[in-house]
Amino acid sequence: GFIVIPRIVHTDTGICMTGGHAWDEVEEADGPWAIRKEIRKQVRDGAEWVKILTTNRESYPELTQEELDAAVDEAHRQGVKIAVHSGTQPSIQMCIDAGFDTIEHGTFLTEAQARQMAEKGIAWTPTITAYTYLYEQTKQMIEAGVDMDNPIAARAVHDQAFFQPAFEAYRDNFKKLYDTGVTVLAGSDMVLYKAPPLPIHQELGYMVDYGITPVEAVRTATYNAASV
């Protein structure tokens, strides 16, 4: 027999600069033409979407404006859509200027930028669940006592300095950003510290906790996602 399943849109591996965010898990490419080549290879192999990664947890953008512009241009030239992992400033603005189809995380997105995204048709996938998990996990590790000779514990101390303000940014700003009219998408992300699977309904629950209605939250995982 047959069963009905969700429509699955295929992406290939992400693309970052040499030594960039998740470099050991994605493809590295430097310069506009290397990025264009990697996108062409992925489209050749069946990718329907492309993902670029351009921030880690620092304030500097990893890819240049020229590289971001080239990535968007090539993906759209090839007839596919393109997402970008970007959480900090000024990278978020650079990605808006480049014209990506979605911004993943957008952790420190401003209201003015969200309005720009709404005007340009750029969607936002906040991934609240991932950052909440990472904040809570690193907080628990620190409260349990940190052995700085343990590299995982030492990393938790370093990461907590980012994950706490990230958690607070989502909690304090999500509803204001949603109200700008930017298209919001539900997403879970893959995270660190041996995280369990992060179900979409948990993401929708945080959205409701932070101020939108249950129907609006469900829409982020259904109609909004299908329309992008």
Residue spans for each PLM region:
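A cross-domain feature marking catalytic cores of carbohydrate-active enzymes
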Residues: 12-13, 52-54, 84-88, 105-107, ...
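Short hydrophobic/aromatic-enriched beta-strand-loop microsegments
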Residues: 4, 100-108, 124-126
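Divalent metal-coordination and catalytic microenvironments
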Residues: 8, 46, 50, 75, ...
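His/Asp/Glu-enriched, well-ordered alpha-helical/loop segment
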Residues: 77, 155, 166-228
